[in-house]
Amino acid sequence: MADALASQLNNTSLGDANSDAKWKDQLKTPAKDARPQTEDVTATKGLEFEDFYIKRELMMGIFEAGFEKPSPIQEETIPVALTGRDILARAKNGTGKTAAFVIPTLERINPKSTKTQALILVPTRELALQTSHVCKTLGKHLGINVMVTTGGTGLMDDIIRLNDAVHILVGTPGRVLDLASKGVADLSECPTFVMDEADKLLSPEFTPVIEQLLSFHPKDRQVMLFSATFPLIVKSFKDKHMRNPYEINLMDELTLRGITQYYAFVEEKQKVHCLNTLFSKLQINQSIIFCNSTNRVELLAKKITELGYSCFYSHARMLQQHRNRVFHDFRNGVCRNLVCSDLLTRGIDIQAVNVVINFDFPKNAETYLHRIGRSGRFGHLGLAINLINWDDRFNLYKIEQELGTEIQPIPQNIDKKLYVYDSPDTIPRPISNPSQPPQATGMPSGQHIGDRRHNNHPNGGHYQYNRGRGSYRGGRGQGPRRNVQHDQNRYNASQGQHQSGKSQAAPVS
């Protein structure tokens, strides 16, 4: 169907090619991203954004944001979404899903109307901020107003902002329902309803809220669902609330092709030493380190700074303004390392992240998939390293089976071609804050992580001390894979010799 629509639009081509070239020459586009990309985003049908015949003002925003050609999910989604048909789209993390629904949503907005014309729901506050920023960036020439609303911020401020025209409302379900129930957010003439990370939004935690929100929309609404995974509950929602949806499935495999995955077996009490070894050996542009609890996030962030590395942290118990500050600064390259809980597993797009470390191994395949998807964004290369203890060995095997992937034992030396770019300073941040200084995009690859000092923020989320060289070098035992007693990846804090016996759960140390 997407091919037929694109062909039909092609046959109705209007305008002069010379005049088209002139307006494109006047755009202030960022430097071209010269990094190689995988087939996750390059296996396209050869369409251009011009083939969708969207408003010129919208195309100006698209090109000025650094987009060059539509990715496969964008090629499939945009022409169908422009017809107003319901869409159920499944594609990998980091392949351009956000722009796939933002572009047709922006195209269908009437800026002369004061009514809210699109609601975009996301499961986390950070993702809401990012999505609203994408809307504002791509639609900056359209004269529309985009508002983001999430829990943890003042309700009265949102009520005041809704007194003005809001064309697109981006938010988390609970806060949007609160505003709609109070009659402050008028969704009665809102024809577009979008859910990003739909599998999370349709979990038992959110489903009742989602169904209440749908009742505020007109019956002839367009519903679009996007996610990397679709459990059975999504099918139930589709049958109940969607009309003959156009289904897109670009998931021939679950994991991104550009991400290399390794595991290292290490006792709990040796994890920090192992992390120090990884920091000293890897060439990190930016890294995200995941823990399974908020307490461990702060403890680990403190340990990392004691090793001499600059580090931010973020988790759900922090004040929202502090979380926002951490997220903003990390996206703009102020710090190299971020320790966090699963708060940032979904949808967060930070192009400069080339390493993800699971300090605590996740309990299920879905969480693992979303975590490692923070690297290797938009077809680029990335590295995922999992620190595995005795209790994680069965989860490791189960996740490999469910995802149809293989997590390799970590080698003594990791080939830099798998995750390192020659000039990380040139990595573009197409959806970034234009007011940020240009030096925030990264650091030369030859410079050791943490070699620059950063100012502390007055409030939580930022651990930063002076740089100190770590001297620990982890050793490796020898033995068959999956033999926990003699794992070839087992790190030892002293001489690299085997240690037998089950490791005991211990605090970060």
Curated annotation (Swiss-Prot):
Gene3D superfamilies: P-loop containing nucleotide triphosphate hydrolases
Major place of residence: cytoplasm
GO biological process: mRNA processing; mRNA transport; regulation of translation
The keyword Protein biosynthesis appears for this protein: no
Gene Ontology CC terms: P-body
Region feature (Disordered): 1-40, 422-509
SMART domains cross-referenced by the UniProt entry: DEXDc (SM00487), HELICc (SM00490)
Catalytic activity: ATP + H2O = ADP + phosphate + H(+)
Motif (Q motif): 47-75
Location(s), subcellular: Cytoplasm, P-body
This protein's record includes keyword Hydrolase: yes
Domain named Helicase ATP-binding: residues: 78-248
Motif (DEAD box): 196-199
GO molecular function terms attached to this record: ATP binding; ATP hydrolysis activity; RNA binding; RNA helicase activity
Binding site residues for ATP: 91-98
Limits of the Helicase C-terminal domain: 258-418
Source species, domain of life: Eukaryota
Composition bias, Basic and acidic residues: 19-38
Keyword terms: ATP-binding, Cytoplasm, Helicase, Hydrolase, mRNA processing, mRNA transport, Nucleotide-binding, RNA-binding, Translation regulation, Transport
Chain intervals with Polar residues compositional bias: 7-16, 432-444, 490-503
Functional note: ATP-dependent RNA helicase involved in mRNA turnover, and more specifically in mRNA decapping. Is involved in G1/S DNA-damage checkpoint recovery, probably through the regulation of the translational status of a subset of mRNAs. May also have a role in translation and mRNA nuclear export.
Domain remark from Swiss-Prot or TrEMBL: The Q motif is unique to and characteristic of the DEAD box family of RNA helicases and controls ATP binding and hydrolysis.
Family: Belongs to the DEAD box helicase family. DDX6/DHH1 subfamily.
The protein's name in its UniProt record: ATP-dependent RNA helicase dhh1
